[in-house]
């Protein structure tokens, strides 16, 4: 039964990836169908992630009160329903509503997946390693979603609506598994008074600041890589440009998945996690700068691959290193705080890139991402110096 619980937790983080990358996967097609510009598309992304910010803070205490299963079932159900709404919404307003509902479903699954994974994998002894392995399946979602979108849109010549509906059907299958699985009772005692106290902990504050930078980077890449590559390939009207751009987005997800699987093979990753975050942040700065200056699609793809590999260990290692400084009973509280704070970056930075790209190019707006990566590098220098691990693997 514990294995099935782990499987559903992995399905949950896989589905969160679908929620985060689906708009980027159909960006060119959706913008053409709705006749909207980059700024309006960026507002859709902001609607999704602003909802995530609010819901992430609320869903923690609900999980403690109701248990994992109701939240998992709700998450899969709402995520599937919002994907169907996104698929068949006839106008911009309903697409925005779909994005809002997508945020609700995503954060239900995010809480279930990311709080269960460090407990059920590696017997709970190495949170950073477990988080990397679990979030490799998030990376898998980043691969499969744009790959399926490209297959459906460009090979099978399906509409973006039909393509998204098929992906929504996949999430419905995951719902069946959640309904059939027994979950452990929630072990985390999320109380508002406890959360307030945690906000004063330097380790929690640093993790939140680091995730603001990281989420701004990951969501920006997931949202704008396809549009960036379409620009470098000559525009949407050039034959095959959108399909090749979609494959570039898939390669970004593939690099993240591979990087997280590799990171999960590092024993006692929690102990060396701060150094890993620092090195990955520095590599991210270099790769993003290359994306900004290059005019070559091939060089851009190489930079995208390096960016995916660099991003791979950052989020799960930040989470794991921070968890290791506290008792497991506080994991839900800590995750709710740092992820909700981090989502502020994912909410506003991609939207800002979109607004700055109107009448210009996505490539010309990417320096914002380079600055975020640089700030993350500076913050990472302090993560290992604040707080002492409560337990070792």
Residue ranges and their predicted role:
Residues 21, 49-57, 143, 253-261, ...:
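Residue-level signature of mid-helix packing/kink "hotspots" within the transmembrane helices
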Residues 98-136:
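Cytoplasmic helix-loop-helix junction between adjacent transmembrane helices
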Residues 35, 67, 88-93, 271, ...:
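Helix-breaking motifs and short loop linkers at transmembrane-helix boundaries and internal kinks
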Residues 23-24, 202-250, 257:
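Extracytoplasmic gate region of multi-pass secondary transporters
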Residues 323-362:
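A late C-terminal transmembrane helix in Major Facilitator Superfamily
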Residues 132-183:
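Helix-loop-helix hairpin linking two adjacent transmembrane segments in secondary transporters
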Residues 54-90:
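Conserved MFS/SLC helix-loop-helix module at the cytosolic interface between two early adjacent transmembrane helices
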Residues 4-38, 110, 114, 221-226:
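Extracytoplasmic
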